[in-house]
Curated annotation (Swiss-Prot):
GO terms for cellular component: mitochondrial inner membrane; respiratory chain complex III. A ubiquinone binds at residue 201. GO terms for molecular function: metal ion binding; ubiquinol-cytochrome-c reductase activity. One of its GO terms (biological process) is mitochondrial electron transport, ubiquinol to cytochrome c. Belongs to the cytochrome b family. Component of the ubiquinol-cytochrome c reductase complex (complex III or cytochrome b-c1 complex) that is part of the mitochondrial respiratory chain. The b-c1 complex mediates electron transfer from ubiquinol to cytochrome c. Contributes to the generation of a proton gradient across the mitochondrial membrane that is then used for ATP synthesis. This is Cytochrome b. The gene is MT-CYB.
Amino acid sequence: MTNIRKTHPLTKIINHSFIDLPTPSNISSWWNFGSLLGLCLVIQIMTGLFLAMHYTPDTTTAFSSVTHICRDVNYGWMIRYLHANGASMFFMCLFIHIGRGIYYGSFTFLETWNIGIMLLFTVMATAFMGYVLPWGQMSFWGATVITNLLSAIPYIGTNLVEWIWGGFSVDKATLTRFFAFHFILPFIITALTAIHLLFLHESGSNNPSGMTSDSDKIPFHPYYTLKDILGVIALLITLSTLVLFSPDLLGDPDNYTPANPLNTPPHIKPEWYFLFAYAILRSIPNKLGGVLALISSILILALMPFLNMAKQRSMMFRPLSQCLFWTLVANLMVLTWIGGQPVENPFIIIGQLASIMYFSTILIFMPLTNLLENKLLKW
């Protein structure tokens, strides 16, 4: 009798993706973050669904409804903070996942990499719209500032901004449509994730050595299911600690003040996971230039497969590239810090230098280092 797991049309898909999937035997814990991102997505959809049951997308009651969730709904405070801090964990895993892809040369899987970039943009859009929903001061002014950036587009900019706002300022129409998009986008993310996995399983996973591992594969279950569970436990402990002990650690105190169009906060800043891009945006004095730099800071990832000159796929055996990679990581941390600082010296010049360093590392130094390493290895 044949195993139903291998023959039934539904279980066959699950079997080929998560059970009998041939996986390289040497992949490290850096490969855990894909499954952790899946877990984060599930947590966000579930907590988001329960929040949507009590939330009202109306400018007069949105702030009160979030307060009502925290005070009157059973474990509403926990659901709300799981959702808010779950987004932070999502981005933490996302950044590590992308970093691993760069370090071990996974960007050579073109389709998987490009769908990953689309996923990054979609997740960023979802998080931005979610931040607007509590309708606090930072929600309102964040929405105003970021949507206003589109007015830098020549000819159609102003019309485009008013079209997105649904009026002449951020108001009820904006909040309602942001709620609608924030609700639908996670399901689009889920669909894109399925396509991401589909393309990944066409080529098979990369591994730390960067070499083909066809001769040395093991089944995903039980080896990597067990290994992933360890990551899941670590993630849940971190998230629970954050939610139960310091739920507002990563938030902004200004968002506990109801939105007031007549009072601008002294310092408008997004959540921590957008600060690096916000710092790049602010480092250019020109509005259109800043917007282009902001988009380029993410889109530059799409150029990585074409800028790669190395004969070895992984950075595992390339110490010069490793130094450059960790310099890039440190640079992104500096940008994140600068994004949260006021626009004054010395922060302005540090932000500008860090932005130049970010783009030149990826566009100039990395390809040159690749060529130098090829030369040193007589390739």
